From Swiss-Prot:
GO terms for cellular component: ribonucleoprotein complex; ribosome. HAMAP family: Ribosomal_bL20. One of its GO terms (molecular function) is structural constituent of ribosome. Keywords: Ribonucleoprotein, Ribosomal protein, RNA-binding, rRNA-binding. Pfam families: Ribosomal_L20. Binds directly to 23S ribosomal RNA and is necessary for the in vitro assembly process of the 50S ribosomal subunit. It is not involved in the protein synthesizing functions of that subunit. It comes from the Bacteria. PANTHER family: 39S RIBOSOMAL PROTEIN L20. The lineage of its organism: Bacteria, Bacillati, Bacillota, Bacilli, Lactobacillales. GO terms for biological process: ribosomal large subunit assembly; translation. Belongs to the bacterial ribosomal protein bL20 family. The gene is rplT. This is Large ribosomal subunit protein bL20. PROSITE patterns: RIBOSOMAL_L20.
């Protein structure tokens, strides 16, 4: 039986990695070994940052809500507690959008929170 050197499989594997590394800077898209390392790192970054993105957006929403709440004389935590007491179930994403797009509606929500806190 003839010896098989596996050049087809090797070329296919290398081609796949170099295709994934397309657009990387310098040797990271030219050389197989460095490209492979960078692709592995890219998978790690993608996995990590899909989770990080959720935390980052929540932080952004809280910062926006806090800024709008302070314009209405409340801190973020007092506003959230007041909304909970008033049985107003609006999530942070929607609250942040309301704070930016419709200041009057946010002010009305802040007033409701103040009333609930006063009781």
């Amino acid at each position: 039986m003839a010896r098989v050197k596996g050049s087809v499989a090797t070329r296919k594997r290398r081609k796949r990695i170099l295709k994934l590394a397309k657009g990387y800077y310098g040797a990271k898209h030219r050389l197989f070994k460095t490209a492979k390392e960078q692709v592995m790192n890219s998978y790690y970054y993608a996995f990590r940052d899909r989770r990080q993105k959720k935390r980052d957006f929540r932080k952004l929403w809280i910062a926006r809500i806090n800024a709008a709440a302070r314009m209405n004389g409340l801190s973020y935590s007092k506003l959230m507690h007041g909304l909970k007491l008033a049985d107003i179930e609006v999530n942070r994403k929607m609250l942040a959008d309301i704070a930016i797009a419709d200041a009057a509606a946010f002010t009305a929500l802040a007033e409701e929170a103040k009333k609930a806190l006063a009781k």
